[in-house]
Amino acid sequence: MEFETIETKKEGNLFWITLNRPDKLNALNAKLLEELDRAVSQAESDPEIRVIIITGKGKAFCAGADITQFNQLTPAEAWKFSKKGREIMDKIEALSKPTIAMINGYALGGGLELALACDIRIAAEEAQLGLPEINLGIYPGYGGTQRLTRVIGKGRALEMMMTGDRIPGKDAEKYGLVNRVVPLANLEQETRKLAEKIAKKSPISLALIKEVVNRGLDSPLLSGLALESVGWGVVFSTEDKKEGVSAFLEKREPTFKGK
């Protein structure tokens, strides 16, 4: 599949998506969003892919939406623009396969919202993260008001959105915005190491973990616990469960097939 604004690479069970507009700091335009949509659909439908990694080329992960067109948007067009971007972020969050945002530099506005749609975020020490939309007289429109608040809490999320300030990688880790921060030189190695570790696990259980956690966040506790129990029963019908238990008893590494 050919793309203009992104690059994709299949590496064993891993699928790498690299935003490829480095001269624009990988800003999100309509073409990039459409190609990102197609790329994640491709990865989701490939049974060999176990983990999806999203990163950016050059010094930015993604500097947000391409604002050059903003003054020409009518209110109706702006609503559609926001809706389209948010739907793609929703799609990434709902993928059955684990996703990792490898934040190599600036993750601002829609770029941070893209990272927030991923399950795990690993950032370089040099990374700068923020939602600066307030400085344009607007506010986040790709899910940031909701996802950031759920990740770091209301107070810190409001401060980030109301000031538009960027925070460095070390503070992002302290806030829980990213899972870990590593030197830029080690970023790809550490991301690949984590992705390969996850890729060895049962795809069915990984998908159910995502489903139960994501749905449980917006449900009463008892509903989330009930969903957890139902999913736990489901995995007992799988070949992966049999393989995992057998491997443990036989003191060997399991080989999960996603069945």
Curated annotation (Swiss-Prot):
Its EC number is 4.2.1.116. Gene3D superfamilies: 2-enoyl-CoA Hydratase, Chain A, domain 1, Lyase 2-enoyl-coa Hydratase, Chain A, domain 2. It comes from the Archaea. The active site is at 113 (nucleophile), 133 (proton acceptor). Plays a role in autotrophic carbon fixation via the 3-hydroxypropionate/4-hydroxybutyrate cycle. Catalyzes the reversible dehydration of 3-hydroxypropionyl-CoA to form acryloyl-CoA, and the reversible dehydration of (S)-3-hydroxybutyryl-CoA to form crotonyl-CoA. Inactive towards (R)-3-hydroxybutyryl-CoA. Monomer. Belongs to the enoyl-CoA hydratase/isomerase family. This is 3-hydroxypropionyl-coenzyme A dehydratase. It comes from Metallosphaera sedula (strain ATCC 51363 / DSM 5348 / JCM 9185 / NBRC 15509 / TH2).
